[in-house]
Amino acid sequence: MAHIPEVLPKSIPIPAFIVTTSSYLWYYFNLVLTQIPGGQFIVSYIKKSHHDDPYRTTVEIGLILYGIIYYLSKPQQKKSLQAQKPNLSPQEIDALIEDWEPEPLVDPSATDEQSWRVAKTPVTMEMPIQNHITITRNNLQEKYTNVFNLASNNFLQLSATEPVKEVVKTTIKNYGVGACGPAGFYGNQDVHYTLEYDLAQFFGTQGSVLYGQDFCAAPSVLPAFTKRGDVIVADDQVSLPVQNALQLSRSTVYYFNHNDMNSLECLLNELTEQEKLEKLPAIPRKFIVTEGIFHNSGDLAPLPELTKLKNKYKFRLFVDETFSIGVLGATGRGLSEHFNMDRATAIDITVGSMATALGSTGGFVLGDSVMCLHQRIGSNAYCFSACLPAYTVTSVSKVLKLMDSNNDAVQTLQKLSKSLHDSFASDDSLRSYVIVTSSPVSAVLHLQLTPAYRSRKFGYTCEQLFETMSALQKKSQTNKFIEPYEEEEKFLQSIVDHALINYNVLITRNTIVLKQETLPIVPSLKICCNAAMSPEELKNACESVKQSILACCQESNK
């Protein structure tokens, strides 16, 4: 028998009046309960409970009495509240409703600060000649005709060819212009499954899955395969869709320096050693997350080194190839073909967009058959978002056939991309003001202000901007207005305006939603080329853009 310390009493004394009162209450309560069917079971429960813990009986009785009193008091409370309500006539109620002004959904100060962005957004009205468009801005107050378009992501322009147009017309006649709903609820038609097969065949994977919106593909796929306790190691310059995917994954996320394989290996080695010491009950899923051609900088991910590291440390590789599919490789098959590697073994999950080089809309995911099957029951965007219209799907199937039979468009695009890059990278007059961050193989050229020029003109650095963003995020401020950043955005827009007004050339700023960004980023200009341009057209347009950059930068120095 266990020894009982002397400090504990052998019994807890109960005051006599409590014992007497409880005895009378129990006697009469017992008489009442014995007259009720099933009451003997309640009596038996109370006896056992009271024998083990007398105070428990008191607490339970008190709670029962409180519940009865609370229930009985509710009707009276309702009556008192009803009496306090003003007796208004219908006319008075209508007058109050008419006078009521709801609070704005958006902070008016934020609307004023962002209004210039809306005014500067171009709207395409028509395209009489390929790559030459008519646009309007600021609610039709500005109109520009015969503008040379260097802002389109339709890199191959195959969707604008007659064979694809004929396929689209036929599909609309046969299928109409919309889908019935999500894929699992009669949204998918035969053409959707045909395109999934075509994508898998073209890119050399076991399967593929279509998504209605390319922006939602990554944020739906990655969370479908991760949970709490899993580990993700991501590049610190991934785009907003991938950032959303990381936030929704519920995993522990680590970042390595942009395209720095030494930084990545050090981090992978550290995590592997940490896992050995922790002796986890289950092996976590582990992913390396990066992009093929980076959305915000245009440079290239080193796939061979990434594949070696993911095999060495037993990680899976997730690559967003929104801007590399249709652009890289001899036949436009993306990052793996560019490095002469087998996609099925090099990359575990590939996310792509049909709204860029393929010239349609929506997104897709490539991988093995098990991964594809799991998405159909576990990916939110696949299960709950509406399917693509049939004509957008058949157009991509036709584009893939054209790419497979003839790679002239891809080869032309790659030559123009290199020419675009060399035109700006080799110009010494620009080096004091802007730097080219893109790879020569990227169809999108990114121009950022040099750190020295940004610091001199706007008084901040990329690191300082990120620190300010992080501080605002900790304060839960959704309206992230940072004046130096806004001034730089307006300055870059002045370059866009100068090229448009003086040379009829349309370029664009890199669209950044600052309040959504969670990683370091700075504004940049974007210049896009496509396979339908002639080398001479592109050269002349590049010269015009360079003149606009020099004019605005030199003017600001005065």
Curated annotation (Swiss-Prot):
Its EC number is 2.3.1.50. Its cofactor is pyridoxal 5'-phosphate. It holds the Pfam family Aminotran_1_2. Changing C180 to W/Y: Loss of activity. No effect on interaction with LCB2. InterPro entries: Aminotransferase_I/II_large (IPR004839), AON_synthase_class-II (IPR050087), PyrdxlP-dep_Trfase (IPR015424), PyrdxlP-dep_Trfase_major (IPR015421). Pathway: Lipid metabolism; sphingolipid metabolism. GO terms for biological process: ceramide biosynthetic process; intracellular sphingolipid homeostasis; sphingolipid biosynthetic process; sphingosine biosynthetic process. It is a multi-pass membrane protein. The chain crosses the membrane at residues 50-84, 342-371, 425-457. GO terms for cellular component: endoplasmic reticulum; endoplasmic reticulum membrane; serine palmitoyltransferase complex. Residues 1-49, 372-424 are lumenal. It is found in: Cytoplasm; Endoplasmic reticulum membrane. Keywords: Acyltransferase, Cytoplasm, Endoplasmic reticulum, Lipid metabolism, Membrane, Phosphoprotein, Pyridoxal phosphate, Sphingolipid metabolism, Transferase, Transmembrane, Transmembrane helix. The modification Phosphothreonine is found at T121. It catalyses: L-serine + hexadecanoyl-CoA + H(+) = 3-oxosphinganine + CO2 + CoA. It comes from the Eukaryota. Changing V191D: Loss of activity. No effect on interaction with LCB2. The keyword Ribosomal protein does not apply. Residues 85-341, 458-558 are cytoplasmic. It is an enzyme of class 2 (transferase). LCB1 and LCB2 encode essential subunits of the enzyme and form a heterodimer. Component of the SPOTS complex, at least composed of LCB1/2 (LCB1 and/or LCB2), ORM1/2 (ORM1 and/or ORM2), SAC1 and TSC3. Interacts with LCB2 and TSC3. Present with 22400 molecules/cell in log phase SD medium. Belongs to the class-II pyridoxal-phosphate-dependent aminotransferase family. The first transmembrane domain is not required for stability, membrane association, interaction with LCB2, or enzymatic activity. The second and third transmembrane domains are required for stability and interaction with LCB2. Component of serine palmitoyltransferase (SPT), which catalyzes the committed step in the synthesis of sphingolipids, the condensation of serine with palmitoyl CoA to form the long chain base 3-ketosphinganine. This is Serine palmitoyltransferase 1.
